[in-house]
Curated annotation (Swiss-Prot):
It holds the Pfam family SAICAR_synt. It comes from Rhizobium meliloti (strain 1021). This is Phosphoribosylaminoimidazole-succinocarboxamide synthase. The gene is purC. It is an enzyme of class 6 (ligase). Its EC number is 6.3.2.6. Keywords: ATP-binding, Ligase, Nucleotide-binding, Purine biosynthesis. It comes from the Bacteria.
Amino acid sequence: MNRRRRIYEGKAKILYEGPEPGTLIQFFKDDATAFNKKKHDVIDGKGVLNNRISEYIFTHLNKIGIPTHFIRRLNMREQLIKEVEIIPLEIVVRNVAAGSLAKRLGIEEGTVLPRSIIEFYYKADALDDPMVSEEHITAFGWASPQELDDIMALAIRINDFLSGLFLGVGIQLVDFKVECGRLYEGDMMRIVLADEISPDSCRLWDIETKEKMDKDRFRRDMGGLVEAYQEVARRLGIINENEPPRGSGPVLVK
């Protein structure tokens, strides 16, 4: 991979040029970040698990007709993806009050919301990814009204699928974050799901115990992040029931 041109490096992934025009290679790092990189560790094995879990979810989404950038997994840390023009928004779908929503509105964490809520955040680390409205999005040209309709329709379908998928293995989907992009195919353009879906980008609670099985374990210094991600992968049937934990836990990066 060192011989390939690096296109972009984010908090948890690196994009390299792909083997064919219109493709990229997405590499999953072991970096764990929170609060827009104010907190940063490297946790051995996290990237491998996120790659496997995201592959599993994107493959199933493709099968049910939800368009994504995913082509196939190449190895333990890399995926082949379609090159898209990323829309500078984080789309958050919330089913249960947690995190910033609970704090912002004074709702007790764990309260089931009257209905699923979609929120938008402008992707700008320097501004701490501010929450924005549909009016902001269309006024500043980040997405057109039609694109916004497409994004919201995708988000609702993804939420329906993920909620059922996780419910079937005893996990409650509290909320999740996705990103979308414009995929150009000849003269045609369509909105597709991009980035990843993994315990890094979802809040996942055990239905019975309410044990957190996501990146909140890192945000809140609870420990056991890799073990929690492994348990998600085991329940989904992605890794063997008896596969031993990878790595030796978090390593602080100075």
